[in-house]
């Protein structure tokens, strides 16, 4: 599943470091100086000091002031925003359903194709897992469920999620955007410990052997990363 996603609109905008931009959640307000983000609770939940990360964290904005219908932001890390870029709101518990309409269609497809495993993205608590299990149970299926831990709320509710899933994926890409990067190793180790405690599968993902897309041999750092995953009793790594 894709899980609860937030994205920019159809705009193409160049954001220069040090300049200011207004961010809006009303598509009627978007223009060359107002960037649209498709999250209706944007101005309700965010304010001065919060950050907005765009395009998988490549562009970073700091909120200076909440104007009610828009957020005045300073561009900390600039870049060019193309249509439908991913948006992260670190530290914010987003008010979106755990399973979207698109996810339900994908889950129906999974049932029709008799898949063995489904990975659930951006899990925040156990409720979404139980909802999907019930959906499968009503159809007489027992498809394995893997929880992707990708945000702070998922980390906070880690133990309750592990208890109701068949395994955990440490999705270090989005997780490393949503939380401080230096916390990643500790969180990965905690997840490994809890998976061992409850006898659940562990998958470590993101940037494993990424250099081999261009080079014939991995870097020493990648070898060490894989070795650490093995030492943590991972059942699989995802390239």
Please provide the spans of the model-predicted regions.
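Non-catalytic helical/linker scaffolds that mediate oligomerization, partner binding
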Residues: 1-239
């Amino acid at each position: 599943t894709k899980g609860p996603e937030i994205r920019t609109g159809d705009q193409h905008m160049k954001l220069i470091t040090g300049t200011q931009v207004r961010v809006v959640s009303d598509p009627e307000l978007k223009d060359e100086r107002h960037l649209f983000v498709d999250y209706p609770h944007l101005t309700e939940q965010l304010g001065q000091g919060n950050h907005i990360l765009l395009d998988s964290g490549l562009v970073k904005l700091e909120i200076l002031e909440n104007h009610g219908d828009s957020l005045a932001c300073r561009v900390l890390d600039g870049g060019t925003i193309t249509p439908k870029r991913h948006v992260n709101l670190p530290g914010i518990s987003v008010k979106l359903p755990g399973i979207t309409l698109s996810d339900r269609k994908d889950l129906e497809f999974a049932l029709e194709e008799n898949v063995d495993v489904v990975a659930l993205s951006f899990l925040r608590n156990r409720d979404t897992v139980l909802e999907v299990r019930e959906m499968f149970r009503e159809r007489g299926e027992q498809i394995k469920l893997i929880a992707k831990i990708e945000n702070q709320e998922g980390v906070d509710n880690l133990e309750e999620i592990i208890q109701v899933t068949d395994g955990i994926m440490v999705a270090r890409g989005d997780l490393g955007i949503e939380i401080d990067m230096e916390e990643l190793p500790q969180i990965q180790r905690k997840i490994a410990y809890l998976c061992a405690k409850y006898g659940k599968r562990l998958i470590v993902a993101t940037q494993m052997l990424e250099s081999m897309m261009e080079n014939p041999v991995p870097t020493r750092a990648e070898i060490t990363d894989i070795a650490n995953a093995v030492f943590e009793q991972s059942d699989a790594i995802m390239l």
